[in-house]
Amino acid sequence: MPPIIKRRVMRKIIIASQNPAKVNAVRSAFSTVFPDQEWEFIGVSVPSEVADQPMSDEETKQGALNRVRNAKQRHPGAEYYVGLEAGIEENKTFAWMIVESDQQRGESRSACLMLPPLVLERLRQAKELGDVMDEVFGTENIKQKGGAIGLLTRHHLTRSTVYHQALILALIPFINPEHYPSA
């Protein structure tokens, strides 16, 4: 009798963004938490239905939730859906992470960092943080690279590394399902 060969099933994760920094953070977090799984990571463009630059904690979280909902509607059948939305409140920037499956939801907010006064002043002109950072620091498309985090920490941290940690925290209900009732 021939040996039984177990095929690993590739599990699909839809990331409600095509931003490389966000996609890399999701890839890194899932690979860290579930090292024995094989994943297919698919970044998709879906609306957040909030301002291009959310200016409150509540609006930012709602943007991440909306991204997950819209990704589920447009791309059914994935095992996980991940929405990430960066925002600003007062003088700080942060991001919300929402991870959903059919049975569960996890959420977490990233660490926050203070923004320079000149950046905050220019943000009042209804611009996105990435665009303002490019103007002030003379960079190009920083939001898809290290982000404001990378610039302001002199690359000791990046957008992806900070999001990685927050995504692992959002995965807690999936790591410990016995302690979290299904959504």
From Swiss-Prot:
Keyword Metal-binding (UniProt): yes
Cofactor(s) named in the record: Mg(2+); Mn(2+)
Signal peptide: none
Catalytic activity: XTP + H2O = XDP + phosphate + H(+); ITP + H2O = IDP + phosphate + H(+)
UniProt organism field: Vibrio cholerae serotype O1 (strain ATCC 39315 / El Tor Inaba N16961)
Pfam families, sorted: NTPase_I-T (PF01931)
EC number: 3.6.1.73
Stated family: Belongs to the YjjX NTPase family.
Top EC class of this enzyme: hydrolase
Functional description taken from the UniProt entry: Phosphatase that hydrolyzes non-canonical purine nucleotides such as XTP and ITP to their respective diphosphate derivatives. Probably excludes non-canonical purines from DNA/RNA precursor pool, thus preventing their incorporation into DNA/RNA and avoiding chromosomal lesions.
Molecular function, one GO term: metal ion binding
Name of the protein this chain belongs to: Inosine/xanthosine triphosphatase
Superkingdom in the source lineage: Bacteria
InterPro entries per the UniProt record, alphabetical: ITPase-like_fam, Non_canon_purine_NTPase, NTPase/PRRC1, YjjX_NTPase
Keywords tagged on the record: Hydrolase, Magnesium, Manganese, Metal-binding, Nucleotide metabolism, Nucleotide-binding
GO terms for biological process, alphabetical: nucleotide metabolic process; thiamine metabolic process
Bridged cysteine pairs (disulfide): none
Cofactor note: Binds 1 divalent metal cation per subunit; can use either Mg(2+) or Mn(2+).
TM regions (residue ranges): none
Assembly notes: Homodimer.
